[in-house]
Amino acid sequence: MQKICSADLVKVSKKLEEFMQYCQKLKAQDTYLIVNRKSPMLAEATHTAAENCGLNVKEIDLKANKPYKNFPSKLIKLLRQETPKAGIGLFDYHQNPEWNLTEVGARIELLHQTIEQVPISWAHSPGITIDMALNGPIQCDYKKMAFDAEHILQQLQNLKKLRITAPGGTDIEVEVGKHVKFDTDCIIVPPGVYGTPGKFGNLPVGEVWSQKGRVINVVNRETGNEESQHYPMKQVANGRLVCDVTAGGYKGKINPEKPIIAQFINGFLVDLKCEDRNLDSIKEDIITSQKKYGLPSVLEEVGIGLNEKARITGNMLEDEKIRGTCHLAIGNVRCHVDLLVNKPAITVYYNNGTTKEVIRNGTFIL
C-alpha cells in the first residue's frame, strides 16, 4: 500500500480543495461521492478536502481482488437514483498494472452509460498514484489551468482540420467535422459539451480534446446476444501515428527504437505495428474487441496536453497532460487506447481558409 505522512496529506488535500473549487465549481453543502479502487490514502486526502469545502461526503470502496468486468450494481444504483452533485473515481493500479487495461471496458461503461446520463461533475482517475499527487500534475495551479484551457479552446473553434507531425515520424491529418467539439478536463461542470446531463474529466487535469460516441445495439459474437454498448464516432484521419513515449493501458515508457505505429485511412485503423513484444497486450485488446463485436477500430480522440507539472513517467494518466504533447486514441467497443506523441507540431486549418500554427516542437506559440 502506498503511504503518505500527515504533512503530505495536508499538501495534497489543499490542492484537491482548489480542484473542487476551480474545476468542479462546488459550494458548501453539495454532495460528493468518492469511489476508492485500492487508493486509500488518496481517498483520505480527498475526503479531507471535501469536508474542508463543506461538502457532504459518501464513499464506496471497490474491493475485488481481480479486474471488474462491470462495476457493482450498488454503485450504479447510487449514481442513478441518489445522484450526488459531484464525485471522483480513484483507480490505483500500481500493484496490478495489467488491471488498468483489463478494466477499461467497465470504466467506459460507467462513464458513458451512467455518469454522462445523470447531472454530475465527475473526476476520473484511472492509474492515479501518490507521486502524481505530491510531486506531479495534481500540484498545478488550477485557477490558471482553467483560464489557459478556455483560451486554447477559443483557438480550436470553427476548425476544418488539424495536421500533426513529430520528429518520431508522425504525419497525420484529422478532419474536424461539425459533429465533433473540443472540451477540457480543466472545467468539469455539467452539462457535457454535447448536452449530456453529466460531465466527466480526468484528475490530474490538463488537456483539451475532441471526442464523441454513442450507445448502440450490437451483437456479442461470443454469446450471440444483443448488447447496448458505447461505440466511438470516428474522426476522419489519414496518415501515420508514431507513439514513442507512452501508451494507454501499458505501464512503462516505450522504447523509441521500437515504437507503436498506427496507420489510418478515412478514420479507420488499417494497420498497427510494434516490434516490442511487451506491448502485445495493447494490440490484443484492440483485436479482441474487433472480433467480439465485429466493428472496426477508429480514431476516437485527439488531445493536447496543458499541465506544466506533468512529467514523462510511463503512466498515460499523467503523461498525456504534459504541456505541448499530443495524444490520439484508437477506440472500439469497450476499448480505448491513448497513444502519446512527443514534441509535436500542430497546425490548425479554419473554415474561413486561414491557418495557424498552435504548437511547434512541443511548445505552444499561441
Segment roles from a protein language model:
Residues 1-240, 248, 350, 355-366:
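Active-site bordering "gate/hinge" segments
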Residues 39, 94-96, 169, 179, ...:
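Short, glycine-/Ser/Thr-/acidic-enriched flexible segments
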Residues 149, 158-160, 224-228, 244-251, ...:
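Glycine-rich, charged/polar anion/phosphate-binding loops
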Residues 156-157, 234, 253-257, 321, ...:
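Short solvent-exposed loop/turn micro-motifs enriched in small/polar/acidic residues
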Residues 227-281:
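Oxyanion-binding "anion nests"
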Residues 238, 257-259, 266, 297-301, ...:
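Active-site lining segments that contact anionic ligands and/or coordinate catalytic metals
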Residues 255, 271-330:
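Dual-mode signal for accessory low-complexity, basic/Gly-rich regions
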Residues 325-366:
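Intrinsically disordered terminal and processing segments
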